[in-house]
């Protein structure tokens, strides 16, 4: 499953951002928030997850599920969000498969 850091790096690369400061400005968060994402000390809130999804042309539910999994306080909650992500990924891949496309949504 992807992580906040995967999305942070993807936005930075896709938008050719020179620094985490530029990334913070684009996301509408503080530089400290980006530092926390990098250090694994915090994840996206739902609004930031939606912004990230829009910047990467992804379905917002994918990024929201990942963010909520990382914020979950219990193993049960993490399983729920992981399951939601997996179901979303499977359904989305199936839909794209019918259209002749195969994205790599699942990540180990």
Named regions from a protein language model:
Residues 1-18, 61-64, 102-108:
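A short, Lys/Arg-rich alpha-helix, primarily the initiator
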Residues 17-19, 44-47:
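Residue-level signal for the short linker/turn that defines the boundary of a DNA-recognition helix
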Residues 20-24, 52:
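Short alpha-helical "recognition helix" segments of helix-turn-helix
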Residues 27-44, 66-69:
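Recognition helix of helix-turn-helix/homeodomain-like DNA-binding domains
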Residues 46-62:
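DNA major-groove recognition helix of helix-turn-helix/homeodomain DNA-binding modules
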Residues 65-108:
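Short, charged recognition helix plus adjacent turn
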